[in-house]
């Protein structure tokens, strides 16, 4: 078995068939991949999917979260490589074959695909990352590009769904997802990138990510703040425990900036009560300050970045 595709689902029966149809028409021979659906305590089981699509379907009565569902899939997988796909997303027809070909050709532990985002109410084509040629990167370049510390005219996103992993590489390094936490992809991506010997950008094969209303970044609840802070703390502890923090200090602070801005945007956009807004933003700032060394952070940023923190809405800085 070459590839195991792991798909967590939760009350997405109406969307998952588009996902499974895109897998079904892939050019890779059907006997070379398996599909495992981990149903994360949906209100109604979807057992008919097993027969209709010739896949493995596992229903969990206990909610595992996306991370826990993927962990179960990793342990069940028989493929040499693993892909994660969200149940409301889909892939291009050559995704599996190109992924397998380039991973074998380059002897890489991680492969990354073009990620195109689709929205409910936006018709423009939006690429979060796009790869037209084969690129090979080491761990340091990959993480610093992902953090936008380095600019190589290429983007790397922390999502795990537009990637393919060597399964034994995950097992040997005991890398699994944090369970029942949002933003789990960032911690998983950093851990895998740090210990990989080679990462590749796979050209001309696309993962289509559907951004629906009500998704993690299109809504807000207090758990978003708690989970973001938990993930950032875990990243810092992991970097420090493995003597990586000095190398990736600036990247860590850039991740903190990015995810704090994301949460603040969610609070501002989706909380209507001004008192709740203030309480949530105060919670974020106070707790994030416990994760950072202010002197280190100030040393890592430019004067212009500092000005933007102090005067975010002022573009014209002329006195007169």
PLM feature segments, named:
Residues 20-59:
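Acidic donor-binding segment of Leloir-type glycosyltransferases
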Residues 82:
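Short aromatic/hydrophobic "clamp" motif used to bind/position activated sugar donors
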Residues 67, 87-200, 209-223:
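Donor-binding/catalytic cores of nucleotide-activated saccharide
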Residues 3-15, 19, 26, 38:
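A conserved hydrophobic helix/loop-capping motif in glycosyltransferases and polysaccharide synthases
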Residues 268-320:
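Membrane-interface aromatic/basic loop that binds lipid-linked glycans or pyrophosphate carriers
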Residues 2-4, 22, 34, 187:
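Cell-envelope/extracellular polymer assembly enzymes that use nucleotide-activated donors
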Residues 11, 23, 39-42, 64, ...:
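Conserved short acidic donor-positioning loop in nucleotide-sugar-dependent glycosyltransferases
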Residues 46, 60-77:
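Glycine-rich, basic loop-to-helix element that forms the pyrophosphate-binding segment
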């Amino acid at each position: 078995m070459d590839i195991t595709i792991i798909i967590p689902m939760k009350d997405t029966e109406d969307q998952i068939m588009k996902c499974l149809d895109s897998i079904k028409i892939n050019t890779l021979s059907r006997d070379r991949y398996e599909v495992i659906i981990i149903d994360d305590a949906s209100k109604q089981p979807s057992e008919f999917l097993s027969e209709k699509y010739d896949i493995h379907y596992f229903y969990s009565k206990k909610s595992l979260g996306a991370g826990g569902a993927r962990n179960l899939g990793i342990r069940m997988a028989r493929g040499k490589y693993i892909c994660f796909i969200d149940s409301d997303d889909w892939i291009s027809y050559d995704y599996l074959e190109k992924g397998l070909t380039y991973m074998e050709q380059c002897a890489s532990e991680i492969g990354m695909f073009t990620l195109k985002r689709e929205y409910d109410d936006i018709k423009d084509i939006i690429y979060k990352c796009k790869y037209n040629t084969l690129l090979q990167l080491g761990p340091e370049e990959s993480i610093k590009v992902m953090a936008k510390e380095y600019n190589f005219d290429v983007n790397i996103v922390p999502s795990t769904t537009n990637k393919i992993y060597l399964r034994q590489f995950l097992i040997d390094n005991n890398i699994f997802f944090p369970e029942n936490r949002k933003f789990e992809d960032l911690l998983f991506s950093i851990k895998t990138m740090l210990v990989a010997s080679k990462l590749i950008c796979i050209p001309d094969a696309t993962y289509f990510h559907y951004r629906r209303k009500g998704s993690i970044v299109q809504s807000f609840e207090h758990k978003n703040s708690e989970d973001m802070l938990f993930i950032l703390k875990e990243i810092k502890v992991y970097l420090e425990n493995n003597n990586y923090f000095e190398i990736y200090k600036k990247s860590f602070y850039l991740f903190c900036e990015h995810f704090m801005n994301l949460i603040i945007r969610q609070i501002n956009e989706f909380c209507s009560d001004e008192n709740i807004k203030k309480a949530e933003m105060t919670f974020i700032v106070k707790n994030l300050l416990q994760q950072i060394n202010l002197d280190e952070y100030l040393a890592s940023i430019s004067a212009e970045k500092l000005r933007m923190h102090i005067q975010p809405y002022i573009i014209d800085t002329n006195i007169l």
